[in-house]
Amino acid sequence: MRFKALLRAIFRFRKTNFSILLIITYAIIIALLVFDRSRYKLDLPNATSDKLRRNLLEQAWSDLQVITQSPHPYSSRNNDVVHDFLLQRVKNITRSNDNIYIDDDYRNKSSILFHQPDVFNSTSKVSRVVYYESSNIIVKVVGSNNELPALLISGHFDSVPTSYGATDDGKGIATMLSLLNHFSSSQPKRSVIFNFNNNEEFGLLGAYAFTYHPWIRDIEYFINLEGMGAGDRAVLFRTSNVETAEIYKKAVKSRPFGNSIFQQGFNSRYIGSQTDYKVYDEYGLKGWDISFYKPRDYYHTAKDSIQYTSKESLWSMLNQSLQLAIYISNEKLIKKSSSNPAVFFDLLGLFFVVVDTKHLFYADIFMLIVGPILLMMKAHLDKRRRLERSRLVQLRLLLSLGLSVVFLLLLTKSLNSFNPFVYSADYRTPLTGLFLLFVTVNYLIVTLAERLNPTESYKTVAINQIFIIAWLMQLYITLRMAKSDFTLTGTYPLSIFSGCLIVALSLGLFGTKNKAVNDAPNSSVRYASSQNDEDNPLPSQDRGENINQVRDTGNQEVTSNTNTDLHSNAEEVDERMPLLSNNHIGDSGKMDKNSDFSKHYNWIVQFLCIVPISSFIFLFSLDYTLDAIHKMVQETTDDVQLICIIITIGVILLALPILPFISKLNYQSSVIIAIIGVLLFGKSLVMQPFSEIAPLKVRFLQTVNQHDISKSSVSLFTAKDTPIKEMIYDLPSVKSQSTLVNCTVFGGSKICDYYGLPPNLVDSEGNRQNKNLMKIEVLKNDNNDTQRSPYAPLSAEIKINVSENRVCSLAFWSQSSKQSPVKKFSVIKSNNNNTNSVSNSIKYADGIDEVLIHKLDFNGAHHFSIEWLPNIPFDLDYDPVIDGQGDNNIEITVACFTGEADSLSVVNGHPLKKIPAFDEVVKYSPKWYTFTNRDRGLVVIKDKIQL
């Protein structure tokens, strides 16, 4: 009997029991989170037992070291160095294999001219045409079964001008070389095609170029390898549908890592970047986007280098890609009839879960229907049991939750006022502090209400009301799911939470049969404060229990303390018993001994149904989301608001599972929680938002003044309220020349302009001012032809000469037309016999606003022609002879981009940095700054012409 009494004491709904269980639950969840985030560091293949994979990793690491020796954007000569290295590596790997074919776009002089919407801004209405000369290296490993469609593996070898490209996308390229090495020695059943593509960074152009290659017609599946962070683990960002998600699940048995929350981030455009996955997906291929996703403040900066990454990080991509590629290339894949998007996530890298979004939609509808039915049944049974709960009890959770939300909003607002960029340095500290304070306020309000109006029914009422809140959220999500054609793949945590609540409600209803607890008419039994549980930890068989029995008589409430002996083994009769029970008090006043189960275990079963699973899913999902995007606060203050909204919603969702039980939190635990919450929130208020390991990323662009190169303006872009102006005034060149710094705020961003050190863009002797960097020649202009018919299209032929340049843009503007009058653009190339001919031409009836030109020749001119329509007034009486011709003039703004970090020019025999202004901000700014490019190059040369 002593053992039985001990068990009852352990599992009673007591403050100590609940507090211990809550602490254990969160300790386990946090330990699992730490384990999940750091486990990849322990996963390197063993050099003895797994020699083959270890050799692949070591070779990939060596390749990565070579690729990342210097920045290598498409516009640089180092880009050609990387291209040549890759081509030679591919030849060395495949030299002894007759089933492998290599195609080099550089050698083939492949080029494309096409109309392209803005891939990074889906809301842009700019009509853009792109001319691109490709240097992709394409390799085909012919499979043994020609009937199987091919697999494409793609990655890009260019970097941005400010980055060494270790993660973006050197690891992807090194992984591809290792995969090619594997398939060259082990012929796959399915042909595998590798696209080592160029110029992904500024338009996904290497992938677009591949869509014009004849081999793409053989492909059905693709794996895109990308880096949108600068290290850590590679994640399955997105995949085409349920079929491809299931393939990943079957293929990647060792350390799967993916979450469809990232996929929804792309679909909803919360993630502004894009990858080549977009191109292949729009072409109609089915595939996987495997990418690194953090840290974003190293992304596209000099810290995206070998120094700041690791073999463990490289292996996380190589391991997933190798498993997936081997499985796809050697299996006859079974196609599913469903092409719906998939909800997917891994569990600690041990299991991978895949759910059809339409199936999740049906499950949500089922829960939306079943939930209210359960609540109505519960209300009916409460009525039969004559349980009458006062309105104060009904309002208790709503009051505590409402006041806590107001308090939470005040805290986040104060944090934004005092330290808005703290989330960039550490989002977990403010998140934890806000969560603990939110729980503390709920605890205080509920405890105070318990003292004023004691009740044992709070848990049940709170579960019901939280389910109603979850039901409303689920209804909103389900309606959005239907409108979005089932593309909402990141809302599954709410579905899991609702499912947990329904299970908890069902246990209360269907655990046992229904009997009235008290047959006395118009009576209800209520306990005094729940603190009484602490007073009698081990109830005696010889002792009755003190019951605060309340009877309603008209409008009067009569209370009497009665020492009632229900049974020698019985304890309180209270709301902790299930609603449907075999264990009841009959007319004899006796209770069945089986009531002990419902009395002592009901709350703990409900706790285990709701809290661990929901808290685990909410915490992991929230941490993944914030881990990926918390650095966005550096972009604009609008992103600060977005992060705050996510944290606020996340805190509420994290707290909801424990609120029904919060009244049983003991005093000691509540004090500790409050103290830790205050300390963490206080730390968040004073924490330095930027540091060497969590730097502020600033975007750089220098605009050359051709008339006076010493007046070349430097523009630094960052979020509003960052201390960028003070840093600029501390630069040696600014101080020595007393240069003015002009900062302008637009939206949530800030741009600061000043005259920086002049660039050294080309090798030169004598005057180092680099005059005539750009020369625009108009070779032909019909607008000046007086014999031209006023109704005939106008045309012009133009040549732009820019030394050491590959990339230019043209913007067309006409004062007389809202829409661009330019309808045709043609690229003109020189032939071997010194004659010119049109190599590519495109017409676009809606008008061309902008043309981007990418050529591989550094010193050749940008030579092109355009056609535009004359301005003809919409007047039937219009006569061009009498009234004269309309305004047919157009303005062309030419911008040519050049320059990459660490590059040199020889001026008067001395090697000098090409962009000393950039070198200056890197060298003399505090160590918690890091810099990246604002545009296609670090330097832009601009000019205008009128036609």
Swiss-Prot record:
Cofactors named for this entry: Zn(2+)
Transition state stabilizer (site feature) positions: 299
Binding site for Zn(2+) 1: 156, 168, 226
Active site, per annotation: 200 (proton acceptor)
GO MF annotation: an example: metalloexopeptidase activity
Binding site for Zn(2+) 2: 168, 201, 300
EC number(s) per entry: 3.4.-.-
UniProt keyword terms in alphabetical order: Glycoprotein, Hydrolase, Membrane, Metal-binding, Metalloprotease, Protease, Transmembrane, Transmembrane helix, Vacuole, Zinc
Pfam family, one: PFF1_C
Disulfide bridges in this chain: none
Compartmental location: Vacuole membrane
Family: Belongs to the peptidase M28 family.
Function: May be involved in vacuolar sorting and osmoregulation.
Protein name: Vacuolar membrane protease
UniProt source species: Candida glabrata (strain ATCC 2001 / BCRC 20586 / JCM 3761 / NBRC 0622 / NRRL Y-65 / CBS 138) (Yeast)
